């Protein structure tokens, strides 16, 4: 059922956590943010992921966040819960708690960071999480943040587990192509990099788990819709204008730039929690000009070349 629930989700937004200036969660800001996303082509929502600043959230805060979002969404789109840490026992206990909490199509579990496990260690970690509950698991492979990379061979080995239903892949397009070619049936493959969405979807990926959809969901939708209708020239033209905006959104550690843009647009995204800090004021102004207005001069002043965001 979870696979079918997520199959038509092309744009899954990795939701920010809005904070007050004192660092507490701003639950009052959630309804407007959610309605904004749903009005601009978000098909699903990931909670308590990297963009949500999950390393700074307690499990109790995450559960409060889950309840608040579920109350607003009311089943209109599938929800995914961030459930993984770098400690297997903690991940097992939390995935059981989230499964009992209910209301989620799947849980997202990150490759363990800091401990630097081997491929066999990664396999055993995810197998233990997937065995622990009935909540379907999506693996999050993001070597830019966790230092180690799960190989396609290990990923495909885990893809045979009946309770592991997909991956958020942030490695290379070559790896993505291999996974798409060799995956079993009913295994979802998402790119986790906004800038790669054009290429990933043309390779046959199922969708994108996105940060840029907070601010540029319409452009993302138009590009993916053009790909679906085999209008590659139109999709490529959108991609060329979209890339500078993605670069701007990752010119400082995420989610600082997207929060700056959301605050400018009138959504109370608030600050980041330490150790993340907001983008400097002048740079934030340039980021806003790029993301909101497509300002080419601001693009040149804000970012150089093409960034590969490790989010």
Curated annotation (Swiss-Prot):
Domain of life of the source: Bacteria
InterPro entries found in the cross-reference section: Aldolase_TIM, DapA, DapA-like, Schiff_base-form_aldolases_AS
Disulfide bridge partners, by residue number: none
Pathway(s) where this gene product acts: Amino-acid biosynthesis; L-lysine biosynthesis via DAP pathway; (S)-tetrahydrodipicolinate from L-aspartate: step 3/4
SMART domains linked to this entry: DHDPS
Binding site residues for pyruvate: 51, 209
One Gene Ontology molecular-function label: 4-hydroxy-tetrahydrodipicolinate synthase activity
Listed EC numbers: 4.3.3.7
Keyword Hydrolase set for record: no
Positions bearing the site annotation: Part of a proton relay during catalysis: 50, 114
GO BP annotations, alphabetical order: diaminopimelate biosynthetic process; lysine biosynthetic process via diaminopimelate
Keyword Cell inner membrane: no
Keywords recorded for this protein, A-Z: Amino-acid biosynthesis, Cytoplasm, Diaminopimelate biosynthesis, Lyase, Lysine biosynthesis, Schiff base
List of catalytic residues: 140 (proton donor/acceptor), 168 (schiff-base intermediate with substrate)
Top EC category: lyase
Annotated catalysed reactions: L-aspartate 4-semialdehyde + pyruvate = (2S,4S)-4-hydroxy-2,3,4,5-tetrahydrodipicolinate + H2O + H(+)
Function according to Swiss-Prot or TrEMBL: Catalyzes the condensation of (S)-aspartate-beta-semialdehyde [(S)-ASA] and pyruvate to 4-hydroxy-tetrahydrodipicolinate (HTPA).
Complex and partners: Homotetramer; dimer of dimers.
Protein name per its UniProtKB record: 4-hydroxy-tetrahydrodipicolinate synthase
């Amino acid at each position: 059922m979870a696979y079918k629930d997520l199959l038509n989700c092309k744009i899954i937004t990795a939701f920010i956590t809005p904070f007050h200036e004192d660092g507490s969660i701003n639950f009052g800001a959630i309804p407007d943010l959610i309605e904004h996303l749903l009005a601009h082509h978000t098909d699903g929502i990931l909670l308590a992921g990297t963009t949500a600043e999950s390393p700074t959230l307690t499990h109790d805060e995450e559960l409060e966040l889950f309840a608040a979002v579920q109350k607003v969404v009311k089943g209109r789109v599938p929800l995914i819960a961030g459930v993984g840490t770098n400690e297997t026992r903690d991940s097992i206990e939390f995935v059981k708690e989230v499964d009992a909490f209910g209301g989620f199509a799947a849980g997202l579990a990150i490759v363990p960071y800091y401990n630097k496990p081997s491929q066999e260690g990664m396999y055993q970690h995810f197998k233990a999480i997937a065995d622990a509950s009935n909540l379907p698991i999506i693996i999050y492979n993001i070597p830019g943040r966790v230092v180690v990379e799960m190989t396609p061979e290990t990923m495909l080995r885990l893809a045979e587990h009946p309770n592991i239903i997909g991956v958020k892949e942030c490695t290379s397009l070559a790896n993505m192509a291999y996974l798409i070619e060799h995956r079993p049936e009913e295994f979802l493959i998402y790119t986790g990099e906004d800038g790669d969405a054009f290429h990933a979807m043309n390779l046959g990926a199922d969708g994108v788990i996105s940060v840029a959809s907070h601010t540029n969901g319409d452009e993302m939708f138009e590009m993916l819709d053009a790909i679906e209708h085999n209008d590659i020239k139109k999709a490529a033209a959108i991609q060329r204008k979209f890339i500078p905006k993605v670069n701007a959104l990752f010119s400082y550690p995420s989610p600082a730039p997207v929060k700056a843009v959301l605050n400018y647009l009138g959504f109370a995204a608030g600050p980041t929690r330490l150790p993340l800090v907001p983008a400097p004021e002048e740079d934030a102004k340039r980021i806003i000009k790029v993301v909101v207005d497509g300002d080419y001069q601001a693009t040149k002043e804000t970012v150089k070349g093409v960034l590969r965001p490790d989010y």
